[in-house]
């Protein structure tokens, strides 16, 4: 039986390597402000085999505040897992807000669905079980200029981030935000070589090094790379 991703992720789980400081941030600022259904979902997800894919609570609060500051109403999420960031988004949107959520594995989403239902925000979510690229291509054909999206959050297959970007920069309105998760990849992107990584992690690491260089040079967006969680790059569409 092959090793799970947790077997080779846990050592380099996050950017912040001071466990004491991380604990302080979570216990002082994040957990006290965490919605009760998010807390329940986090605790269930932490017991899951792929728990390393969980968006941390402090990052969730960051996403929530950004959505509210933007007055976002129409959003896209690529990569859902158990739905922590999805529930975060749904809670932050107004009552008539809408999320198009895309993931290849509905069974993971169903782990989080009871918490989404208890939070009373299921009506905001359109979950699509599919690879993301064909769905995005269909959305490009069907979405009118006046119906462009305010915000997109990407936390899916890392080697496709650049492909997602080419679609999202057309689907998200001018002034809207596209966020890419994990762009610092446990800090390993800082090094031309990083021996000892699992082959899948090395592919992701190289993909992120290329993506980071590409986004920094893309004139269609302005960017800010934030060292929260495992690194989040915010792109604001300029044209």
UniProtKB/Swiss-Prot annotation:
The species is: Narcissus aff. pseudonarcissus MK-2014 (Daffodil)
Report residues binding S-adenosyl-L-methionine.
55, 77, 79-80, 85, 103, 132, 157
What is this protein's name? Norbelladine 4'-O-methyltransferase 5
Gene that produces this protein: N4OMT5
Q: Supply the EC number(s).
A: 2.1.1.336
What are the GO BP annotations of this UniProt entry? alkaloid metabolic process; methylation
Q: Reaction catalysed?
A: norbelladine + S-adenosyl-L-methionine = 4'-O-methylnorbelladine + S-adenosyl-L-homocysteine + H(+)
Pathway stated in the Swiss-Prot or TrEMBL entry: Alkaloid biosynthesis
Keywords for this protein = Alkaloid metabolism, Metal-binding, Methyltransferase, S-adenosyl-L-methionine, Transferase
Q: Which GO terms describe its molecular function?
A: metal ion binding; O-methyltransferase activity; S-adenosylmethionine-dependent methyltransferase activity
